[in-house]
Structure formats: C-alpha cells, structure tokens
Amino acid sequence: MANTITPTPHQLSLPLPLYTAEKIATFTDSRGESFDIMLGADESIVQQLRKKSLDTTDTDLQDNTSDFKRFGGGSYEEWYSKGRTPFALVHQASVALAAFAWFGPKPLGRKSLKYLSEAELKEELNQKEKTWHTLVYRSYLPYRGKGLMGDFIRFAIAEYRKHYPEAKLWVGGNADNAASMGLAERLGFKRRDDLFDAEKNWMAMVQE
C-alpha cells in the first residue's frame, strides 16, 4: 500500500496570521496511519516544535540543524516575521508533530544560523529577496525513516507554488547529511557546485 494524500478544499491566502494553522490535506501512510497536513503552525504545533528542537537526545537533529538555537532559544515570532510559510505533518491519533517544513524568501546560498558568523547573524533580519525561496524540512522520532517525507514535501512544494509560482526553490545543508540531500535530489533539486563551502562542508541544491 502506497502513501495517499487527500486534499481538503480551501481558499487560504498567504501569508497567514501568526499562530494560524489550517488543515489542507489528509495523509495516509503505507501502514494505514493517518496524519493531517497543516498549512501554518498554531501554538500547539510551535510548542512541540520548540520541545523537539531542544531535545539533545536527538543527535541527528542537533548535528544537522540550527533548530536548537532557531526555535529552542530564539523567538518564533521573529523567525516568522522573515516571511516564513510553515507546513506541519501531525499524527491524527496522538496529535504528535511528525514533520515540519518551511519556505520563504532567502538569498541563494545564504547559510543557516549554524554556519553564520556573528556579523552575518546581525544582518539576518535585513535580507531582501524575491526570486529565491528556501525550503527546509525536518522529520521527528518515531516517524523519521518511515517513508513520509517524500510525499509530504512534494505536496507542500506544490501548495507553495500555487501562491508563489515565480519562486525558485533551493535547499542547503551539511553535505554529509545523506538523508536530507538524498530527499532533495529525489524531489528534483540539483547540486550547485559553485556554492559548495568546503571549509564548512556545506552544499546547496536548486529547483528552478
């Protein structure tokens, strides 16, 4: 049995107000487990996001993301103010956050917080970009590695492009994060060797 996604009719426009989440689809995985795909993030989702970002036992998350600083120690409101559009995958029975993704304007090749210098961090809120939009995604235990992310992110991309059809998407991260970069490749992203940072082992991939 393959994953199936059943869209929920809606007429939402972006950006959504802060702490707003609307169901846009039902996701049923290959084992028959049901999830809600949410556009936006309400306070319940953000609370889970913060808790998971602070979980130091999740070494994959801590080693490969800036979420401990971004969501655990930082302001969600400030992050959202940068034009971010979040999507959440929420397990229906337990209401647990299974995966989280976001899009938003960001200059091509601009690294995440984990890789920025102090001077670059001070400029983070002053970026002006319209053409290139970043895509970032996370999956959380115990749902990581269960075959959910490809279909979830593919659906999120299609939804986001309805609102921003001219946007060029890019992803970036640790070149050794085979799962994340492999997913990007399966989604049609292509590596940009000219943006590879050998010192920080950071790479970018684009989908134009």
Regions picked out by a protein language model, each given a short descriptive name:
Residues 140-141, 169-181:
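Conserved beta-strand-loop-alpha-helix junction that forms the acyl-donor binding cleft
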Residues 52, 159, 183-187:
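Alpha-helical interaction/dimerization surfaces of two-component signaling modules
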